[in-house]
């Protein structure tokens, strides 16, 4: 068994060794390389497939030989550096590929030119065989790849650095590739044999019919292969950067060099920005990532005139100085700092160079570097800016760069070596004689490394031992602990650099911040001093590096040079000649290398920065294609002119030096180069297809089905299938709609149609806009098209204005004169003069009539016609247009248009020409009307004549019957009217639906009342204009005519029958007979009324004349046809109209307005009245009744109500008490009944249509216990009882005179001053409190008793308090609006947060706008001060907490919808500071009466400047946006910062003090800018300012109108028309100049919203969070633990003091048990360094820190733990764990090793894989 296991183990280990051996791995990687196919395979396959015969065999052999030879050369080039340099450079591939491709095509197309005619088999003169060999060889060297990734080939290169026996690996990988290649060729051969032997292919009809197909295919195969080769070559070369045309690294000249030199902190391993390189070209596409590109290069290759591009200029080495910051040695950073004079602000320091040096540059250029600069550093693909820390713009290169470094005393290959450092060291070694080129042996290096490590370890150990010894002597521990080293600016004053700039502070504060000189300091003296200082530091840094080696010979010379330089510079530091000396030295020892630029600018930034002194020469980021269109030039000298700048919209504006306002017009074309840095290599967009001529966005082929297709792609079967299916369904469907759902179906259909129409209209608008954009871009892209189009437009404008239109006017008036009509010269000329031709920019910005836009011939022009002339056949009076439909008014065309190239009119630029109104269209319309009237009249006369003829034929028989029918009919009417007095409910006169089918079921006959109500309200909401409603009217008219005819026939048949209510069927147009009788009676009194009211009859004579005409018409024409019909019509129409006139005249005495028009067709629905009245009706329940009131008059119904002596209106109370906007009840009628005492006068409703007031009142009534988001106890204790009683009395005030009310309120306030028992008198500023009560008074009055007032425009009377007068003047009072909040501006502009009237928005509002309360975040303390703080403090505290809960529980979304937003502020305030608000109030109330005194101090310090009261402005800004919960963190952070200032003091007192100081500071600003800065920095750290999105478009439209108005002398007409069209919005008019941030936020232009960026948690924030938890814990401990023991440290013996301190487990305030770990005496950096050095100690592996442990003065801390029996068990485990983790195996050590030891660039990419890849340390 043992033998078997041993054999098995050996076999496994043997297999593992074989698998891991270099040969097997090489074979495997080589085999994988076979699958990376290049274009050379095309030649190989062509030789295999096509060639036949002996010559074909030779070609096959030569192709295979060339192919294998090329691959072998590629493998060898990996190992052999010269061959790698020859083949690996990008320019070698370019130089070889282009000529060879030309030769190859020439060879294929002119084959016989090279053919010498010799066909001998062994002849070497046959060049075709040699060419096959060369093709395969050269194209194998080109190394293009067909597959997407070339990773398979690079696997060999990667594994090269892992193995030691590199030659064996290369050989084995080549053999593996050869095996794979042989297998592949065998597989191809087998496929060819299978094709030849396959009968199915031979039996193909097409192949058999075409005999010469194979021969033709073979002859054209060369052409096919050449095409494929060309495609692959272009495909591959497209990914290789062109070395000639790519833009070189454009450094920001000497300025940016100075920027980088003044960086305070430098890291050893620079961060690489950007992801892994995305280029997919050849292996050597990126020269900087190659292994031997810089290492093995001949140092003599670059001579003295070699140039390195900086800022796009080639400069010789004499122009540059050299300054480095990183050294390879020791892998430790070399820090440099410059102590600059003056302010270090964001400006730039210019160093002036001589022009002579620049002129010599071109002549000294080597021609090779002009064409191929392989050391060129291409730009990254994108540029990511960061305003705070600006890192260098890096190339998108791989993170891995291979170079040699020293690790563990050996030279090893590091895969994360900084490439810039490698290049830099090589250049230094070539050019500088001070650096040795001799390489030390491996033993010397290892000894040197060991020596240095020992020295460092000794130093650190000694320092540590010294600290512990000092501790033994009794010194304090705090003095012995090592502190962090800080960089000091001034040793005398002990001023340190800020933490963020301090290079010695690593980790959290690390970053690069650029400093510059301020412009005031830039002068020649400072520049020279600065240069002098720079040279001193440069020489010092360069030469100081070389004094580190003790073993190296010739050190004396270097030390001598160093001393000489230092002595000279230090002695003569003030001499100006030093600059010359240092420059001479500089020429010998220094050279500047290319530096990464820090800030790249785009085109917009370049234009904005043109006014600056140190502006950049050219932009380096390609921005969107834009054209700058100047729209206004300010000739006046006005430096404070406003600039409109908004870079997010399509149009942006900026000012130039000449005072030009310009819009930037962006092209709508797809711009693939947007935001790409110039010179950066473009990644190939393989997954993007451009299918259209104008394609705005790039699309992946994956989403091709979602793109609008071309015509030949537009055939979509799914749409056709849908249409066919719908048609099939519609054929089989049975439309059976019941009567009850008929109206609902109609409304749904109409709504659906409307939605579809709106949707279609929007889609059509989008389509038209797309077409317009394409047309505009076409004009913009064609050369000289804009100039041609502009000239044509100007010619068309002149032709239209001065030739075409005048000729049309003359022709029209001449024709009118010929037709004997009055000419209209004046009207036509007036309209012609009104037409304006305004020149606009290309995107439609209006300029003026005479001024052309700048560069209009190149940029384009539009001509806008304002008030275009319309030639009319006659002019109507303008009064007739007033009574038009509102829908028709909306559909009227705009009174402007744009001129097209063809002279047509278009509504938008490049839009489709609109249809012009024809001159003859109104003439034809009038003629058609006249013809229709003539036809109608002729038809009536013909029918009358026919009826007369029939009448005369039957006259003798009908005369008897006529008299009998008339007498019986009159008798029945009289009887019916006499009976109707007994039934009062019939006075309502309801009409009944006539049912055509009397045998219908009872369930189906009455339509549901609810559906009718829905139908009526939907019609009401559309202003009674609806297609379905008109359709219904037409159907009702037809039904009426039918029912009238049927009813007349029934009346004639039922002459002798009685009329029963339950059985009769009357048409919808007929009234009940009771109503007819009443009308008949009322008609008797008509003569008396006419005599009394002659004047009114004269006014209303039109109606009486109309009635008389109708009577005459009935008597003369229709009496002959049918006598009963005449009687019925008379009783239906004439008495009804008379009664309406009587009602009108009766109510005219009470109200001066007409209630109801005669013949009113508007449907007013009294559905709820009918619903209530049905309860006490005397009708039979089984009768089929439906109450249709579509034509019933309101006046008639209420007249009937007024006639009743005793009426019970209890059932109608719900209607009459409706507090919202009435949908069916007129206010005047309710007022009339209120006067008569029918119901309460308070039930009167306003004309306010929205239900906003109703919601407001219901909310206030339902939530009266909260009273505006305050708890009930707060509200009850807010003020004294007298004031509450007076406020409640005020709710019942019915006096409409607001001036009296204001006087009454003023008396109240003055009376308040005299009260001494008021509890809030202790506050210092009584005026503020009075104003608060006054404010609440106004709010309550307006909100609760609002509907009792008509035309309520509140005028605030001034009131005097403390001898300070405040006057308000009111402006823009709109009497047409029922509610008009006065937007009064206080004259003295003292707009503090306590002002009553708020002017943040215009007073013209369409909705209720109570904007009085200003609840701020900190104003909650002021609310607290209103309350009696001396009593019930605990309840108040809990109520405040409850108040916040109430705010959270309330649905804020509903509040914001209809409520005024001031109350929502409290909710938002709680969201922002959910923790801080209650804590603050708890702290304040702990202080008892201090609250009032604090408020005294605060109120005394208030400033009257409105823009400095930041808290109020903050609240106004907070209300504008919904806040995210991210704000909690920032606000807590700011407030907790004040809590943690001093932990030893009481937390609450400190919080109150800091808050009070902060509030004082906030009021003591000198300018608006200070307020704005404080506002942004202190409060809104995680907020961002942004434009209101809806304002963007409005502002741009306003700017377009302003451009025209500024140029006009009389712009009034244009202003009015533009306001009517909606182009000019008045609410964003900037009337004032220089608006501050607070005012912009008031107007809603700037909005503060929370940032949506990801917030990186700072170390401070994490610390605050942890301390916050500790504070809470500590607070609990302090409450529970009343007795404390003081801890002390024995000064004599360190270990004894630790033993004494074992009682600390019971004392939970101190954490001194950390001192059990002695290493804590050192700083973390030195601690880490000491551990690593101890682990490197290879000689004494077991002696770990023997100096520390074996010291006599300190006992081993492990014994202390053993001896201590008083420790808790948990604490014991914790200390043991800490001793185990802390000194030896901390995670921090791994991170440190990862960064500094293994040269990893970015610590966040730390992974264990890299540790495994790196060489292991030797363990001895």
UniProtKB/Swiss-Prot annotation:
Residues 250-310, 744-763 are annotated as: Disordered. It comes from the Eukaryota. The chain crosses the membrane at residues 18-38, 67-87, 90-110, 127-147, 175-195, 224-244, 1103-1123. It is found in: Plastid, Chloroplast inner membrane. Residues 256-268 have a biased composition (Acidic residues). The keyword Nucleotide-binding does not apply. Residues 293-310 have a biased composition (Basic and acidic residues). GO terms for biological process: protein transport. Keywords: Chloroplast, Membrane, Plastid, Plastid inner membrane, Protein transport, Transmembrane, Transmembrane helix, Transport. It is a multi-pass membrane protein. One of its GO terms (cellular component) is chloroplast inner membrane. Pfam families: Ycf1. Belongs to the TIC214 family. Involved in protein precursor import into chloroplasts. May be part of an intermediate translocation complex acting as a protein-conducting channel at the inner envelope. Part of the Tic complex. This is Protein TIC 214. It comes from Populus alba (White poplar). The gene is TIC214.
């Amino acid at each position: 068994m043992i033998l078997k296991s041993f054999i098995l183990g050996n076999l496994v280990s043997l297999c593992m060794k074989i698998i891991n051996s270099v040969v097997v791995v090489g074979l495997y990687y080589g085999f994988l390389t076979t699958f990376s196919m290049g274009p050379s395979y095309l030649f190989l396959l062509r030789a295999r497939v096509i060639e036949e015969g002996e010559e074909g065999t030779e070609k096959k052999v030569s192709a295979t030989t060339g192919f294998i030879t090329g691959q072998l050369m590629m493998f060898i080039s990996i190992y052999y550096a010269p061959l790698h340099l020859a083949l690996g450079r990008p320019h070698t591939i370019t130089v070889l590929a282009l000529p060879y491709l030309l030769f190859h095509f020439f060879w294929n197309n002119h084959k016989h030119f090279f053919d010498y005619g010799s066909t001998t088999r062994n002849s070497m003169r046959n060049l075709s065989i040699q060419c096959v060999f060369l093709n395969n060889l050269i194209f194998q060297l080109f190394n293009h790849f067909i597959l997407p990734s070339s990773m398979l080939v690079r696997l060999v290169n990667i594994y090269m650095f892992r193995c030691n026996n590199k030659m064996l690996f290369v050989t084995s990988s080549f053999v593996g590739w050869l095996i794979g290649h042989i297998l592949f060729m065998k597989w191809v051969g087998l496929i060819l044999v299978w094709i030849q032997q396959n009968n199915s292919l031979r039996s193909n009809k097409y192949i058999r019919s075409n005999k010469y197909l194979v021969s033709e295919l073979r002859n054209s195969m060369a052409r096919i292969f050449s095409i494929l080769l060309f495609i692959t070559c272009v495909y591959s070369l497209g990914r290789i950067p062109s070395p000639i045309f790519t833009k070189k690294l454009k450094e920001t000249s000497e300025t940016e060099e100075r920027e980088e030199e003044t960086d305070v902190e430098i890291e050893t391993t620079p961060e690489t920005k950007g992801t892994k390189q995305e280029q997919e070209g050849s292996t050597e596409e990126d020269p900087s990532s190659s292994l031997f590109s810089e290492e093995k290069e001949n140092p003599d290759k670059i001579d003295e005139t070699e140039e390195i591009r900086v800022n796009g200029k080639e400069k010789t080495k004499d122009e540059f100085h050299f300054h480095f910051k990183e050294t390879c040695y020791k892998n430790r950073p070399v820090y440099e700092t410059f102590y600059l004079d003056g302010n270090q602000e964001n400006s730039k320091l210019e160093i002036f160079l001589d022009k002579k040096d620049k002129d010599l540059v071109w002549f000294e250029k080597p021609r090779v570097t002009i064409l191929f600069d392989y050391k060129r550093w291409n730009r990254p693909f994108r540029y990511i800016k960061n305003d705070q820390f600006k890192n260098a713009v890096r190339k998108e290169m791989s993170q891995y760069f291979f170079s040699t470094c020293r690790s563990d005393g050996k030279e090893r290959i590091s895969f994360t070596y900084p490439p810039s450092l490698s290049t830099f060291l090589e250049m230094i070694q070539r050019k500088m004689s001070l650096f040795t080129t001799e390489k030390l042996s491996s033993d010397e290096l290892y000894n040197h490394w060991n020596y240095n490590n020992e020295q460092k370890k000794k130093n650190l150990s000694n320092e540590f031992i010294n600290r512990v010894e000092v501790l033994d002597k009794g010194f304090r521990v705090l003095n012995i602990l090592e502190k962090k080293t800080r960089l000091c600016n001034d040793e005398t004053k002990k001023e340190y650099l800020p933490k963020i700039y301090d290079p010695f502070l690593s980790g959290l504060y690390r970053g690069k911040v650029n400093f510059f000189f301020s412009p005031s300091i830039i002068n020649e003296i400072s520049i020279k001093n600065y240069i002098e200082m720079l040279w001193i530091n440069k020489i010092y840094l360069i030469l100081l590096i070389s004094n580190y080696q003790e073993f190296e010979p010739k050190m004396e010379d270097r030390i001598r040079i160093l001393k000489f330089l230092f002595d000279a510079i230090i002695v003569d530091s003030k001499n100006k000649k030093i600059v010359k000396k240092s420059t001479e030295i500089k020429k010998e020892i220094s050279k500047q290398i290319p530096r990464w630029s820090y800030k790249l600018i785009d085109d917009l930034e370049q234009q904005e920065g043109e006014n600056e002194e140190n502006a950049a020469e050219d932009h380096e980021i390609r921005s969107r294609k834009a054209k700058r269109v100047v729209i206004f030039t300010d000739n006046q000298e006005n430096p404070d002119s406003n600039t409109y700048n908004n870079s997010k919209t399509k149009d942006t504006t900026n000012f130039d030096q000449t005072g030009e306002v310009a819009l930037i017009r962006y092209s709508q074309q797809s711009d693939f180069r947007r935001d790409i840095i110039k010179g950066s290599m473009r990644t190939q967009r393989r997954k993007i297809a451009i299918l259209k001529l104008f394609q705005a966005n790039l699309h992946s082929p994956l989403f091709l089905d979602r793109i609008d297709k071309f015509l030949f792609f537009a055939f979509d079967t799914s749409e056709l299938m849908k249409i066919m299916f719908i048609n099939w369904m519609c054929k089989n469907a049975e439309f059976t709609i019941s009567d009850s759902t008929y109206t609902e179906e109609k409304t749904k259909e109409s709504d659906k149609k409307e939605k579809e129409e709106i949707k279609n209209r929007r889609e059509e608008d989008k389509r038209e806009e797309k077409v317009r954009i394409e047309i505009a871009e076409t004009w913009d892209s064609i050369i000289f098209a804009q100039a041609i189009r502009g000239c044509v437009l100007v010619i068309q404008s002149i032709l239209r204005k001065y030739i075409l239109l005048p000729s049309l006017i003359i022709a029209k008036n001449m024709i009118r004169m010929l037709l004997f009509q009055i000419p209209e010269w004046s009207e036509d000329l007036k309209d012609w003069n009104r037409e304006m031709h305004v020149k606009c920019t290309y995107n439609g910005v209006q300029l003026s009539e005479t001024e052309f836009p700048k560069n209009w011939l190149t940029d384009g022009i539009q001509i806008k016609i304002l008030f275009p002339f319309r030639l009319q056949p006659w002019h109507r009076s303008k009064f007739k247009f007033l009574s038009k439909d509102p829908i028709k008014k909306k559909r009227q065309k705009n009174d402007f248009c744009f001129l097209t190239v063809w002279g047509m009119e278009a509504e938008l630029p490049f839009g489709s020409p609109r249809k012009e109104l024809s001159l003859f269209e109104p003439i034809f319309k009038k003629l058609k009307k006249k013809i229709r009237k003539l036809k109608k009249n002729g038809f009536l006369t013909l029918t009358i004549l026919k009826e007369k003829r029939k009448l005369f034929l039957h006259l003798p028989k009908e005369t008897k019957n006529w008299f009998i029918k008339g007498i019986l009919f009159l008798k029945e009417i009289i009887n019916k009217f006499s009976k109707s007095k007994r039934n009062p409910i019939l006075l309502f006169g309801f009409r009944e639906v006539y049912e055509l089918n009397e045998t219908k079921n009872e369930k189906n006959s009455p339509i549901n009342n609810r559906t009718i109500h829905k139908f009526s309200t939907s019609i009401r909401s559309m202003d009674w204009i609806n297609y379905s409603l008109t359709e219904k009217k037409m159907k009702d008219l037809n039904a009426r005519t039918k029912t009238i005819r049927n009813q007349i026939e029934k009346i004639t048949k039922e002459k002798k029958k009685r009329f029963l209510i339950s059985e009769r069927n009357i048409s919808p147009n007929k009234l009940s007979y009771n109503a007819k009788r009443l009308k008949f009676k009322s008609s008797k009194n008509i003569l008396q009324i006419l005599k009394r009211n002659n004047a009114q009859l004269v006014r209303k004579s039109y109606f009486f004349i109309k009635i008389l005409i109708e009577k005459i018409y009935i008597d003369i024409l229709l009496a002959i046809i049918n006598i009963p019909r005449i009687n019925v019509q008379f009783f239906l129409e004439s008495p009804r109209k008379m009664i309406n006139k009587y009602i009108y005249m009766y109510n005219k005495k009470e109200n001066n307005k007409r209630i109801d028009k005669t013949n009113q067709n508007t449907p007013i629905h009294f559905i709820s009245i009918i619903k209530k009245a049905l309860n006490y009706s005397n009708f039979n329940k089984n009768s089929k009744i439906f109450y249709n009131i579509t034509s019933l008059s309101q006046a008639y119904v209420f007249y009937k109500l007024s006639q009743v002596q005793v009426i019970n209106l209890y059932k109608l109370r719900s209607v009459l008490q409706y507090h919202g906007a009435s949908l069916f009840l007129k206010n005047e009628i309710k007022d009339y009944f209120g006067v008569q005492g029918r119901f309460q006068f308070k039930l009167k409703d306003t004309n306010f249509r929205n239900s906003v007031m109703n919601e407001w009142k219901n909310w206030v009534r339902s939530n009266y216990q909260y009273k505006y988001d305050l708890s009930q106890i707060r509200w009850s204790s807010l003020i004294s009882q007298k004031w509450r009683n007076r406020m409640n009395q005020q709710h019942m005030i019915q006096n409409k005179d607001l001036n009296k009310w204001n006087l009454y309120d003023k008396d109240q306030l003055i009376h308040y001053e005299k009260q001494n028992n008021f509890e809030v008198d202790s506050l210092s500023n009584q005026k503020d409190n009075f104003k608060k009560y006054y404010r609440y008074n106004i709010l309550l009055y307006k909100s609760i008793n609002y509907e009792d007032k008509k035309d309520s425009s509140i005028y605030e009377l001034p009131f005097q308090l403390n001898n300070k007068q405040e006057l308000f003047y009111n402006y823009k009072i709109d009497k047409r609006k029922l509610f008009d909040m006065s937007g009064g501006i206080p004259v003295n502009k003292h707009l503090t947060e306590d002002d009553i009237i708020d002017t943040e928005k215009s007073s013209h509002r369409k909705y209720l706008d109570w904007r009085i309360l200003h609840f701020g975040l900190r104003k909650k303390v002021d609310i607290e001060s209103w309350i009696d703080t001396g009593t019930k403090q605990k309840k108040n505290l809990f109520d405040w907490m409850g108040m916040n809960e109430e705010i959270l529980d309330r649905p804020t979304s509903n509040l914001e919808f209809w409520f005024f937003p001031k109350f929502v502020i409290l909710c938002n305030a709680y969201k922002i500071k959910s923790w801080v608000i209650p804590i603050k109030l708890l702290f304040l109330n702990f202080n008892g009466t201090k609250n009032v005194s604090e408020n005294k101090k605060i109120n005394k310090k208030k400033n009257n400047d409105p823009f400095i009261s930041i808290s109020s402005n903050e609240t106004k800004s907070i209300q504008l946006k919904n806040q995210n919960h991210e704000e909690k963190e920032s606000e807590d952070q700011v407030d907790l910062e004040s809590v943690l200032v001093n932990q030893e003091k009481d937390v609450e007192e400190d919080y109150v003090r800091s808050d009070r100081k902060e509030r004082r500071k906030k009021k003591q600003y000198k300018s608006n800018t200070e307020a704005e800065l404080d506002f942004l920095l202190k409060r809104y750290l995680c907020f961002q300012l942004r434009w209101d999105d809806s304002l963007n478009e409005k502002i741009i439209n306003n700017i377009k109108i302003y451009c025209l108005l500024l140029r006009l002398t009389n712009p009034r007409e244009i202003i009015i028309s533009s306001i009517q069209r909606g182009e000019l919005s008045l609410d964003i008019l900037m009337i004032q100049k220089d608006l501050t941030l607070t005012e912009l936020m008031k107007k809603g232009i700037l909005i503060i919203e929370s940032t949506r960026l990801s917030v990186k948690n700072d170390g401070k924030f994490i610390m605050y969070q942890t301390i916050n938890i500790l504070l809470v814990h500590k607070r609990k401990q302090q409450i529970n633990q009343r007795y404390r023991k003081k801890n002390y440290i024995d000064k004599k013996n360190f270990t004894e003091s630790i033993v004494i301190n074992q009682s600390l487990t019971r004392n939970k305030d101190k954490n001194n048990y950390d001192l059990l770990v002695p290493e804590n005496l050192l700083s973390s950096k030195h601690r880490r360094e000491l551990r690593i050095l101890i682990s490197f100690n290879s000689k004494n592996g077991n002696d770990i820190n023997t100096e520390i442990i074996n010291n006599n003065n300190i006992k081993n801390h492990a014994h202390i733990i053993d001896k201590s029996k008083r420790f808790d068990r948990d604490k014991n485990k914790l200390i043991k764990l800490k001793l185990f983790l802390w000194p030896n195996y901390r995670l921090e050590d791994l991170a440190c090793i990862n960064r500094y030891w293994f040269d990893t660039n970015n610590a966040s990419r730390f992974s264990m894989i890299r540790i495994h890849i790196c060489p292991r340390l030797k363990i001895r």
